[in-house]
Design a protein with these regions (language model features):
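Active-site histidine-anchored catalytic micro-motif
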Residues: 1-141
Length: 141
């Protein structure tokens, strides 16, 4: 069985945001699968998706801090600057982390590790929403 849809993630400020619960609420079809795979793809070039530590908020703060050190804004060597100081660094950060993730589904639930969560990584300052393409493939209950 296949399921495909788009979902909107609204009003995430710049930073690393745990969205596992939001995904589970907006994609209740996960519960219908005995076994399968969930693929999430973000339809933007200045935000990304990743899976990482879900328990300690300081992990999110550390990610933002070190990504900003690795890929600083206002670098005089950037040529693509017409959309603001945060735009080109956002493209680079997005390329480093990636735009899609795949997660196993088992017995109607995401089969993440104990400390794993899904992150939306927002690399721009003033974004109101992001669109994710959701595809599930598997065997239903």
């Amino acid at each position: 069985m296949w399921i495909e849809k788009n979902i909107i993630i609204i009003n995430k400020s710049r930073g690393f945001h745990l969205i596992t619960d939001e995904i589970e609420k907006k994609v209740p079809e996960i519960n219908d699968f005995r076994i399968g795979i969930l693929n999430l793809f973000i339809k933007h070039t200045s935000a990304s998706l990743t899976i990482n530590e879900n328990a300690d908020k300081s992990v999110r703060n550390d990610f933002e801090y070190y990504f900003n050190k690795m890929v600083p804004e206002k670098d005089l060597n950037y040529e693509h600057t017409s959309e603001g100081d945060d735009d080109m660094p956002a493209h680079l950060k997005s390329s480093i982390l990636g735009n899609s993730i795949s997660i196993p589904i088992k017995k109607g639930a995401l089969d993440l590790g104990t400390w794993q969560g899904i992150y939306l990584c927002e690399h721009r300052n003033n974004i109101t929403e992001r669109t994710l393409s959701v595809i599930i493939n598997g065997v239903n209950n």
